[in-house]
Structures are given as structure tokens and as C-alpha cells.
Design a protein with these regions (language model features):
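Short loop/turn motifs that connect adjacent beta-strands in outer-membrane beta-barrel proteins
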Residues: 26-32, 36-54, 195-216, 264-282
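Repeated loop/turn-to-beta-strand initiation elements of outer-membrane beta-barrel proteins
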Residues: 116-121, 142-147, 196-200, 266-268, ...
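Outer-membrane beta-barrel transmembrane domain signature
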Residues: 72, 76-94, 228-337, 346-349
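Transmembrane beta-strands of outer-membrane beta-barrel proteins
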Residues: 55-59, 119, 141-147, 188, ...
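Transmembrane beta-strand segments that form the barrel wall of outer-membrane beta-barrel proteins
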Residues: 114-134
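Outer-membrane pore/translocation modules
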Residues: 137-248, 345
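Outer-membrane beta-barrel "beta-signal"
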Residues: 188-190, 372-386
């Protein structure tokens, strides 16, 4: 878990910047941070309980699955003899599909936060695949911002058809890459709740705010995704598509929807450090979105000399508008300073484009590429506020 050390270093830095004085009182830097993270005065204290900002630590366990599917359609020249013995050159359709589908697996992680700020990292447990997730998020009553980096390694299964069934040169082949393919994504999610007075979006997920009574709010959301799929250029499947071993996408989406907090039970604390606090909450969030910026690029590599593969061409295209969505469900229970949270979320995107690349000194025919990525996660969080 190589990301653990940067995270611990960050926590240590925050601790250094927010020291207590000799009498155990908060220092100037700590008081400044508290002021920045102070809740809005617009919050209704009869609807939302806001405890004083404190350090939190949590361990997480994930049940998750990631999958990626890509198809590429193009044509290649092929030769055959006519009944009269004449050599005929014709265009033969080729269909290639690649599937990087991970098995249902588990992951473990840690979260460290202060007030509305939180840093987290997780890594999968066992299995042939390798997954790392690192995220930073800020969640308050009216705002939420999450920045997440995701990396996934797993062998790629592929299927190729050359020509049409019944043709003399028809081929139908399956295979798997010798080296794992890689998926990487950088995601930025931002949400705004219009009902910032009586609704706390983060109440079911973090335990930094507590909803006293049921409430909902219309939401505005935005999503930025930078995604990458790549395989080793030495793989045979890369040569089938003129050396295309890397595809990337950049997408920006905007949308709106509704989020609702159902509070079956709440009891206010009666002593310091939230002693006596009891809270049970369920959150449902759904936001349809429109992806208005959708850029796709494909990169070709060629073995120029001595087994060293070098980028020889790159093609960038802008895609069409498409519909996306954000869906999330969370359940949280708090007992004094301890909290248990169960949540489920999805992260998906799709792309398509037609690329024409120069490969091996020849200009390739147009390669139509379509890809889709889907990752769902169910997370159990056990946290404590200090």
C-alpha cells in the first residue's frame, strides 16, 4: 500500500500545523481551521445537529466489482482468387472486443479526517487483479466535493472475428493478454443542495453532521472524468488494431436531481464529546446528468528498433452528448462518538470515436472504438471521533 505513507505524512503535517499550546488549548492555526470549517449560520439547529470539529478515524471494508468492455470495428484488405484465377483485393470486416472484467472482490481501507475534510485510501484483498483507490472529500450540509484516483490491473480477455461467417478466410479467435491491462480514472464530483437550512447531505456517510428530522433537497451536480485504458504494445491484440494500445477519454457532465434523508430515530447528546447521542439515518440520492464535453483519443505504438515501442501517432476526436447519472444510497447509525455507515455507489462512463492513425509507415483505415466502464462499490465504515 504505497499510498499509505503520503497519507500519513499529510495527517502528520496537519497535526503540526494545528498544534495545541502548553495549556492544551487550540493554537492559532487550529483555530483558523475551525473557523474555515465552521457550519453556515443558515443551518436550522432544530433540524441539524452540528458537533464541534474533531479528528475522525475509520476503517472501511468494500465489496466491489469493476468491469470494462471495448469493441473496435474496422476493415483490412485481403486477397482471394476469382474462378478465372484472377487475384482480387477486397475489404474484409474485422470485429475485436476486449473485456477487462474483474471478479467480485473485497477491499480494505482507512479514512482520516477533521471536521468536513476527509482523506481515504483502499486496496483490494487477494485475487489476480490489483486495485488502488485514493480520495479526498469535503462534505458539509450544502456542499460536497470528492476527488478520487482509481487504478485497476487485470488480464484482458479478447475476441476477434475476421470476415463474415461462410467466407473462405473467416476466423473466430479468443485469447488473453500475457500482461495485465490497466484502467485508470481521475474523478471529480461536486454537489450543491438548495435546501441548506434543514438538509445535511453528508449525514448518512461521514458523521460530521447529524440530521434530527427527515428532510430532502433538490441537488445540482457536476462530474469530471479523465479515463484511460491501455495494454502493452507488444501484445498481439495491439497489432490487430494497427498498434492502438491506449485509449483515453475526458468528460464533463452537469445535472440535477433529488436527495432525501429519512431519520427514524434521533436523540441529542446530554454531555461533552457527544455522550448520549443516538442517530439512525437513511439517504437516497439520484441525479440524472448530461455529458456535454466528451473527448476521445487513441494512440498507436510501433516497434521502431531493438524491441522499444514508441508512440508513432495520436488521434483526438470530440464525441456527442450522452446521458449519465449519479446514484447513491447510505445508512448510518451513531452511538456516542462511534458510527457505523453502510453505503453503495456507482461510477461509470462510456465513450466512442473513430480514429485514423499512421502505423508502420502506412495510413490505417478508420477504426471505430466504443468503450464502457462500470464500477460499483458497497462500503462498510466503522468510525470514531476523537
Amino acid at each position: 500500500m504505497r499510498h499509505l505513507f503520503p497519507a500519513l505524512a499529510l495527517v502528520a503535517t496537519l497535526s503540526f500545523l494545528c498544534p495545541a499550546d502548553a495549556q492544551g488549548q487550540k493554537g492559532p492555526s487550529h483555530r483558523l481551521l475551525d473557523k474555515i470549517l465552521a457550519p453556515s449560520r443558515a443551518l436550522d439547529p432544530n433540524a441539524i445537529y452540528v458537533p464541534a470539529p474533531r479528528w475522525t478515524f475509520a476503517v472501511t471494508g468494500d465489496l466491489r466489482q469493476a468491469s470494462f468492455f471495448q469493441t473496435q470495428d474496422f476493415s483490412l484488405p485481403s486477397a482471394k482468387l476469382s474462378p478465372s484465377g484472377e487475384l482480387i483485393i477486397q475489404e474484409t470486416p474485422v470485429h475485436l472486443s476486449a473485456n477487462l472484467r474483474g471478479k467480485l472482490g473485497t477491499a480494505a481501507g482507512v479514512q482520516v479526517g477533521y471536521g468536513d475534510l476527509c482523506f481515504s485510501l483502499s486496496k483490494n484483498l487477494g485475487g489476480e487483479d490489483t486495485e488502488h483507490v485514493f480520495s479526498f472529500d469535503y462534505q458539509s450540509a450544502g456542499y460536497a466535493l470528492q476527488v478520487q484516483y482509481f487504478s485497476y490491473l487485470n488480464p484482458v480477455n479478447y475476441h476477434q472475428t475476421f470476415g463474415e461467417e461462410g467466407d473462405w478466410a473467416y476466423r473466430d479467435e479468443d485469447g488473453m493478454t500475457e500482461k495485465p491491462g490497466q484502467l485508470r480514472s481521475f474523478l471529480v464530483d461536486a454537489f450543491y443542495a438548495f435546501n441548506r437550512r434543514t438538509f445535511a447531505y453528508s449525514a448518512a456517510y461521514r458523521g460530521n453532521l447529524f440530521q434530527k428530522r427527515s428532510a430532502g433537497s433538490w441537488m445540482f451536480g457536476s462530474k469530471v472524468i479523465l479515463g484511460e485504458y491501455r495494454i502493452d504494445p507488444e501484445e498481439e491484440v495491439a497489432h490487430w488494431v494497427n498498434g492502438q494500445a491506449r485509449q483515453t477519454t475526458a468528460q464533463v457532465s452537469l445535472g440535477g436531481g433529488y436527495s432525501y434523508n429519512l431519520v427514524p430515530f434521533h436523540r441529542q447528546p446530554y454531555a461533552e464529546r457527544d455522550k448520549g447521542l443516538r442517530n439512525l439515518i437513511i439517504n437516497l440520492t439520484f441525479l440524472p446528468m448530461v455529458t456535454f464535453f466528451n473527448q476521445f483519443s487513441s494512440t498507436a505504438y510501433n516497434d521502431l528498433e531493438n524491441g522499444v515501442y514508441t508512440r508513432v501517432d495520436k488521434d483526438v476526436r470530440n464525441g456527442k452528448l450522452q446521458v449519465n447519472y449519479v446514484a447513491r444510497i447510505g445508512i448510518g447509525y451513531t452511538y456516542n462518538q462511534f458510527s457505523v455507515n453502510l453505503s453503495a455507489s456507482n461510477n461509470d462512463y462510456s465513450y466512442q470515436g473513430i480514429s485514423s492513425l499512421t502505423y508502420g509507415g502506412f495510413s490505417s483505415d478508420a477504426v471505430e472504438t466504443k468503450g464502457s466502464f462500470f464500477r460499483w462499490t458497497t462500503t462498510l465504515r466503522l468510525g470514531m471521533r476523537f
